[in-house]
Amino acid sequence: MKLTTVTNVSVDGVTQGHRRIDAGPRHETDAPDEDGSGTFERFGWAPPLLDDAASTFISQTFQRADAFLFGRRTYEIFAGSWGAGMDPGNPVGEALNTRPKYVASTTLTDPRWADTTVLSGDVAGAIGELRAKPGGELQVWGSGTLIRWLLDRRLVDEIVLLTYPVVVGQGTRLFPATGPDLGLDLVDLLSTPKGLTIQTYRTTGRPQYEAATA
C-alpha cells in the first residue's frame, strides 16, 4: 500500500486550529494534532472557505482508503465522533468504521474503536510492513506530529495538501523550519470555487540541486 498523507494547510503552512473542535458537531476534517493551547488564538480559519467541491474531494478520498494510520490525538478525536456513530450513513464514517485503523502510540493500550491496531515498539518497521502489503492506500489524516516523523524517515509515498487561501500568521506548521529535504512530482491539481487548491504530490527522494559553477 502506498502511504498517503492528507492535510489541511493555510498558504503560510499552518495546520493548527483549522477548526474549533470544541464547537458544534465535528466534521470529517477535524483532525488537528495540536490543540491550540498557549498563545494560539486564530481558530476556525478553514470552515468559511470550505465549499462543496472540497467536501466532495474529502469524502471521495476517505472512500478510496484501504486502511488508516493516525497519531494518538487524531485517533481519539475520530474515535469520539465517527467511532461513536456520528452522522450514520455518511460515507466518511462508513470508511472509517469498516476499514482497518492503525495508531502509532506508546501510551494507548486499550483502543475501543473496532478494528484498531496499536503500533508501538518498532513503529517504522511496522509501517514498512504495511507499505509492503498489496493494495491501494494507507491514509494519514491530520496527525501533524506523526506526519513530520514519517517524513523524517522517508516513509511517505504521496502528500495531499488542501491549501486554503488564507494567511494565519501563527501556529504550528506542517513543515518545520529545519527538516529533511524532499523531491516531489505533482500528479494532480484541483481548485475549488472558494479558492482552495488541492495538490497531490508523489515523493521522489532527495531533490536535485544546481551544481556550483566556477
Segments and roles (model prediction):
Residues 1-155, 165-214:
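Portal/gating segments that form or line small-molecule/metal binding sites
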Residues 160:
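Conserved catalytic/dimer-interface elements of ABC ATPase nucleotide-binding domains
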